[in-house]
Amino acid sequence: MLIRNYRGLLGTKLGMTQVWDANNRVVPVTVIKAGPNVVTQVKTPDSDGYSAVQLGYGEIDPRKINKPARGHFATSGVTPRRHLVELRTADAGNYRPGQELTGEVFAEGTVVDVTGTSKGKGFAGVMKRHGFKGLGAGHGVERKHRSPGSVGGCATPGRVFKGLRMAGRMGHARTTTPGLTIHAVDTERGFLLVKGAIPGPDGGLVFVRSAAKRPAPEAIAPAATVGAGEEVSA
C-alpha cells in the first residue's frame, strides 16, 4: 500500500469565530489549540512491518496510569501523556522519540482532515437521525407523521433486515470532516485557524492530519495576477 508523507497533531477545539481575509471577506474559522505533541514511539517496516509515528498529547498524573503504560513512556524518555494517536506516514524515520511538535508542522493553505467525537443528540427519530421525509401531513395520516413507515413485509421477507435505519441514539461518535483548509497558523499561541466547522463540542479532543484525498490541481493553483496596464488575452 502506497503511503505518503503525512503531518498530524492532536489538539483541543476552542470554538468558532470569524476573521477577514485579504479581500475583506468574512471567513468563519474554528480555533484549535494544536499541541504541543511529543513523539512517544517510532515504528519502522523493519521492526513493526509498517511506517508510523505515535504522538502523545496532554499531561496526566503518573499515578493514574498502569505499569505497562508507565514503562512505555519511560522507554521513550517522556512524561506520561493523556492521549495517544498513531499517524501512518512514509517519513517516520525522520522523527525521534521525545521530539516535540507544534502547529508549525502545518502551513497556511494546507488541506487537512479533522477527526473528533461529534456532539451527542440523545435518542432521535428517523427524520432527524437519517433525514427521512416522514409520512404525509394529511390525507388520512393519523399520529404517524414522523414514523419511518414499513420496516418489512409480514410474510415476505417475514423479518426485519439487519442494518435497517431506525430511531436510536444519535451522535457521540467518531466523525471526520475532510478537505478543510487551514486559514492561518498562530505560532506564538499555538493556534490553528481552520476554515469551517469541525466535529465535537468546545474543549473536545481533535486530530488534525494531512488530507487523505489530495485536492484537484486546478483547485489549489494560485490565481494569475495582472499588473497595471496589462491586458489578459483570451
UniProtKB/Swiss-Prot annotation:
GO MF terms held by the record: rRNA binding; structural constituent of ribosome
Classification via PROSITE patterns: RIBOSOMAL_L3
Segments forming a coiled coil: none
Any one biological process term the GO annotation gives: translation
Cited InterPro entries: Ribosomal_uL3 (IPR000597), Ribosomal_uL3_bac/org-type (IPR019927), Ribosomal_uL3_CS (IPR019926), Transl_B-barrel_sf (IPR009000)
Domain of life, per lineage: Bacteria
Entry keyword Thylakoid: no
Pfam families for the chain: Ribosomal_L3
Gene Ontology CC terms, in alphabetical order: cytosolic large ribosomal subunit
Gene3D superfamilies, per the entry: 3.30.160.810, Translation factors
Residue ranges of the region described as Disordered: 137-156
Record key words, sorted: Ribonucleoprotein, Ribosomal protein, RNA-binding, rRNA-binding
Family under the similarity heading: Belongs to the universal ribosomal protein uL3 family.
Its biological purpose: One of the primary rRNA binding proteins, it binds directly near the 3'-end of the 23S rRNA, where it nucleates assembly of the 50S subunit.
Complexes and interactors: Part of the 50S ribosomal subunit. Forms a cluster with proteins L14 and L19.
Protein name (record): Large ribosomal subunit protein uL3
Species of the source: Frankia alni (strain DSM 45986 / CECT 9034 / ACN14a)
Source taxonomy: Bacteria, Bacillati, Actinomycetota, Actinomycetes, Frankiales
